[in-house]
């Protein structure tokens, strides 16, 4: 397995990242096709044996059960310092409403850490752009999460390049923690990100985490 620095961070991640949306209890959340824990654990173990150290999940995957399954498997099969764990915030989980308000972010990170059984995540990503919350409120809350030691870094996902550029500029102006990664829909067939997002990320030193787009 080959490893690379993740953008400007001190994280070294495997070239392959294991996306964990498929892991989750089928009777929780919106996807009945997910793999329950007994089927998920061998895949996570095999990924670790193959050298994958980068795991990406989200608070909303299978109503939080993806985080629970991934957290338990990593505790059993790996040392915390040997893996890079990323999760996301935005979508509804249980009675937590959708969005990126300060209250939602602060509650969500605590809930994610509890489900993962971890003291911190390596990357907390915003899953979407929140059109109903001022971006300044979102960015300041993310900065406070980093200052509290609950996330080492923050990342973004699924937004327009103009929105991402606005957020990066506001972070610079206020001295807030900067986005270090962009997880976007990008593959050999869908290459729209080559127009604006990838050049922006290259210019800003932001790592790109290609995903199928969920």
Feature annotation, model-predicted:
Residues 1-83, 147:
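N-terminal binding-site loop/beta-alpha segment at the start of enzyme catalytic domains
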Residues 24-38, 92-106, 127-132:
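Active-site mouth loops of central-metabolism enzymes
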Residues 6, 18, 40, 47, ...:
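Conserved, mostly hydrophobic/aromatic
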Residues 21-23, 58-60, 88-92, 126-129, ...:
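Active-site beta-loop-alpha junctions enriched in small/polar residues
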């Amino acid at each position: 397995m080959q490893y690379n620095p993740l953008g400007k961070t001190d994280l070294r991640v495997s070239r392959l990242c294991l996306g964990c949306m498929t892991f989750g209890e089928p009777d929780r959340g919106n996807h009945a096709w997910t793999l329950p824990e007994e089927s998920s654990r061998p895949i996570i173990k095999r990924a670790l044996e193959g050298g994958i150290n980068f795991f990406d999940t989200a608070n909303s995957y299978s109503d939080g059960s993806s985080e629970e399954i991934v957290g338990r498997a990593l505790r059993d099969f790996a040392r915390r310092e040997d893996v890079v764990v990323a999760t996301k915030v935005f979508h509804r989980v249980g009675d937590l409403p959708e969005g990126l308000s300060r209250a939602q972010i602060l509650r969500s990170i605590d809930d994610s850490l509890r489900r993962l059984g971890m003291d911190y995540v390596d990357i907390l990503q915003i899953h979407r752009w929140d059109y109903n919350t001022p971006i300044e409120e979102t960015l300041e809350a993310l900065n406070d999460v980093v200052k509290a030691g609950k996330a080492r870094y923050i990342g973004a996902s699924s937004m327009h390049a103009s929105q991402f550029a606005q957020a990066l500029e506001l972070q610079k102006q206020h001295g807030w923690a900067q986005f270090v990664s962009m997880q976007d829909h990008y593959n050999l067939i869908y290459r729209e990100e080559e127009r604006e997002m990838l050049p922006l990320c290259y210019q800003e030193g932001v790592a790109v985490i290609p995903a199928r787009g969920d």
